[in-house]
Amino acid sequence: MATIQQQKIRIRLKAFDRRLLDTSCEKIVDTANRTGATALGPIPLPTKRRIYCVLRSPHVDKDSREHFETRTHRRIIDIYQPSSKTIDALMKLDLPAGVDIEVKL
């Protein structure tokens, strides 16, 4: 039994701002659909919360503390049957600086 290997590009996106992440996902999906590839997603992954506990006072008041948190929002987009035109369009795509992108072929 021979299985046909299907070409796929997996794009993982991370950002602190959810709206910035969603607009970047829309741009990627629109670009993939315009070039003839099929895009599956964006698939939301669990949001990571990182909480930092800091003393409010520089001196002895250990009971007075302040909490800060960062939330990292993540998405996955799978692009099936990408052509060379699709890859060129994705490389030329201008995305905001606050979005971290990881691409796997």
From Swiss-Prot:
Pfam families: Ribosomal_S10
Sorted UniProt keywords: Ribonucleoprotein, Ribosomal protein
TM region(s), chain numbering: none
Molecular function terms from GO: structural constituent of ribosome; tRNA binding
GO BP annotations listed: translation
InterPro entries assigned: Ribosomal_uS10 (IPR001848), Ribosomal_uS10_CS (IPR018268), Ribosomal_uS10_dom (IPR027486), Ribosomal_uS10_dom_sf (IPR036838)
Listed GO CC annotations: ribonucleoprotein complex; ribosome
Complex and partners: Part of the 30S ribosomal subunit.
Family to which this protein belongs: Belongs to the universal ribosomal protein uS10 family.
Protein task: Involved in the binding of tRNA to the ribosomes.
Cross-referenced HAMAP family: Ribosomal_uS10
Name this polypeptide is given: Small ribosomal subunit protein uS10
Organism placement in taxonomy: Bacteria, Bacillati, Cyanobacteriota, Cyanophyceae, Oscillatoriophycideae
